[in-house]
């Protein structure tokens, strides 16, 4: 009976080991050409406990790497390889040496010929196979390149001349892909070679693991034609547009609770809002340099958005009177102002009945300070507000204003703030000297700048939403995402990089679309400090990894819509996931490629990220996952329930 053989060609030792120990089918082939590992690593890989047979190969040896080929194959044999693929391009004396080692270690011998340019004559191929069997091969492998049907017919014509199950003959290239199937279905070839994904094929025309999943393994299929606009981007752009004098057009806007709250704040700042389809026309009337910040009332209502609250607290210092910041729902339970002492250095007094919780009243006048050190451990949102407010501050300083931030978390959100500020003509350059620590930033800028309206600015698609859909595709689907900016400053674009590092079955097309399919996920370690909104996507991905994954940096999750680390663990455990927070403060998740959760009732705790992650987990569960409040997903993606139903092929009543 033919065996599935996973072909792995990577110099990443940990990745190779994870696949060897986690692949649950028949054989894993390690292509040793790129594996410039230490001897101890080769020994460890080929001697490790595993559920599969392990094949060592060095497919294309040349004079330049012949010594490496023989040495690596020898070490693999001595360390416990079950099969060794010895190329006929290796000199005869070295082949005999390798075959002797294999015989002594009980390792099956494959003698192979690979032609990467054409398919030679049938007689030549037949003589080559006969010679390999006479040399002592257990299996002979003849692989050529097909240009058309005649080449395919020629390679498959070898089978009747040799014992069943001992010849592996097929053609590479797209024209030859069908020979791979016919070799096993009609001719009982010993193996069919699969790649982990399309970008990790070892040859053109090779099938991938995805092609051999059962239909029930791929419950999630389809296109996400329009991801929501990034609320992180939209909120910053809306507020900055309201701080201008003149009209800004913001394209590709999609409403969500937090972005709509930003529009209400803009109106409280005196801006006029006109909606033209998915375009926002925002006309601001501020002249902060001459008049200070003008508000319609003494209160700014920010809805449920912590970002808005933290942007508005420093901005309130540009008004000429006390301003009260207030909100609603879960925001009233969140500590929104951890920087009262810092703000006092800039002349602001922040007061409230509950220390640091809304409502808060800001009084005083914002004044620049030449050099201010900031401990950024409480996040970047208030610092973003300071960058905007200080840039617009009409009080001029004789010296440039410096903000020196250390222990910075969510640092990429500061980069996003600076990018959007730049669109509106506000300059906040990094300090030119090298920063030794990625979690340190020094900004310097002049005060008294004027925000200028933008003729046209497109909202970026939301990478937080995209990350969850990409994780869902990698775990159980075939999903295509449209409209993403791969050069985005949004922190959650890191998910794309993680999936590439994971060798996920991911393809980026020329038009920018991204397709991701279920492949083989290996366990991973990830520090979530700078990307706290990725937690749901990471858990979904980890649940389908072949082993234990670890997420650190959970401190950033305690002051979200819920105590996010705690509630994610509680609710995913409620539906059958194996995950826990250890004494070291890290989250450990046990996964399995075929794992099915129990399902059942669970709570979103009013947290839109948790609600969406649990809804995705429904596709990995035996029973329906029933969430008490999926509607809270509207905080960032109102159309999420309908979009997910479309991908699952369900009709919503």
Question: What residue spans do the PLM features occupy?
Answer:
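Short, structured segments at the rim of ligand-binding sites
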Residues: 210-653
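Acidic (Asp/Glu)-rich catalytic clusters
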Residues: 18-24, 37-51, 74-79, 96-106, ...
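Catalytic beta/alpha-barrel core
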Residues: 7-9, 27-37, 55-65, 81-92, ...
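Catalytic alpha/beta core domains of metabolic enzymes, predominantly
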Residues: 90-215
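Short, acidic/polar
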Residues: 9-22, 65-75, 121-131
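Glycine/small-residue-rich loop that forms an oxyanion/phosphate-binding "nest" at active or ligand-binding sites
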Residues: 53-97, 300-304, 318, 323-325
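Short, well-ordered coil/turn segments that N-cap beta-strands
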Residues: 2-4, 24-26, 50-54, 80-82, ...
